[in-house]
Amino acid sequence: MSTVKQRTRTEGKPQYPLMQSIKDTLKLKTTKRTNSEKKVSTLNDKSGSPIKSNSERRNGITRKVNGSKRLSAQRVALFKYNNVQVFNYVRNGNNSRKSSMSSLNSSGTVVMCNEYDSEVTNLKPQMLIGKGVLELYQIKTPAALDRKEQTMNYISLGRGGQIVHPILPKLKITKLRNENFKYLITFSNPERYWQIEFLQINGQLHDELLKITDEFESIISSVCIFIDENITKLASLKSNKTPPNNVNTLDQIKEKVQTATENDDDEAEELDYLLEDPIEQEPTSSFEYDVPTDLTEVFQRTMGRINSNGSRRYSSVPQFSHRRSMIRRSMSLFPEHEGRFS
C-alpha cells in the first residue's frame, strides 16, 4: 500500500529532461550579459562617450549640456599681496547723506575732491574685518561659438578667501588724498565702506610698495571706477582758475602798440618844433650883471643841454616841455631879457 502511494507522488511531480535544463542555463547567462550592457550604456551619453565624474569636470573636461558644448569655469589670478588690513567704515551722522548719495548715484563719472571730501570726512572706522592676504581674481566661463564668454571679477580677503565680494563695473575705489597706501571702497545696496591699507613687509622698501600699489591701481582701473584724489584735486584747482581771454589780450596789445606809435609821432613833432626854432647865442655879459648869479647858471646849464642835445631825439618829451615852461616863467620876471630865451 505504501509503495503505491509513493509511486503516485513521483508521478504527480513535473519531470525536467536534460535538454530543458541546458536551455535554462543558457537563458540565465544571456540575461546577465544584457544587464551588464545596460549598465555600461547608462554610463555613456548620447554620443557614446563616457560621462566624466565631478572631479574631471572641475579640471576643465569638455561636456555637453542641453546639446551645447561648453567648457567649465576657469579662475585667473589678477593681483595678490600678503599684508593688508581692511576696516569697515560707517557714517558719522546723517547731515551729509544727501550730498554723499548724489556722488554715489553719479557712478560712471569722475567725482571731484570737493564733492568727495564730505563723504570721507564724515566716516568713522567701525571694526577690523580682515588682515593678511588681498587677492583679485577673475572667473571666466567659456561658452559655445554662438555665445559670448562670461567673466566676473572678485576681491578676496584673508587666507582661503574668508571674505569674497564681486567687483562690479560700477564699484568705486578711491585713493585717499596724501595717502600712498590707503584706498576707500564704496559699496551700494546696502551702503558700506571699506578702507584698505597696504602694509610693508619686513625688510620691504618704500619704493617697492609703491610699485605694488601702482600695479593694484592699474588692475582696479580696468575693472571698475578708480579715483585718485590727489589728481582730481589738482584738476579742480586748475578748473577753478579763470582762463585768459585771448581776444581781450590781443586787443589790449594792439591798443598799446597804437598808443605807443601815436606818442612817437607826437614826440617827433615837438622835437621838430624845437629844432626849427633855434635859440640864438648872444653875449651874456650884460645879462650876467642884471640877472642873479644862481638863476643865470640855471639858464646857461639848461640852454647848454638843449643846444648840445638838440640834434638827437629825446625819449621823454615832457622833459623838454618842462624846461621850456620853466625858462619862460623865469624870463617873465625879466622882460628886458625875454627875447634871448624865447
UniProtKB/Swiss-Prot annotation:
Biased composition (Polar residues): 41-53
Pfam families: Inp1
GO cellular component, one term: extrinsic component of intraperoxisomal membrane
Keyword Membrane applies: yes
Keywords: Membrane, Peroxisome
Entry membrane topology: Peripheral membrane protein
GO BP, sorted A to Z: peroxisome inheritance
Key word Coiled coil present: no
Function: Required for peroxisome inheritance.
Family: Belongs to the INP1 family.
Protein name per its UniProtKB record: Inheritance of peroxisomes protein 1
Organism: Candida glabrata (strain ATCC 2001 / BCRC 20586 / JCM 3761 / NBRC 0622 / NRRL Y-65 / CBS 138)
Lineage: Eukaryota, Fungi, Dikarya, Ascomycota, Saccharomycotina
Gene designation: INP1
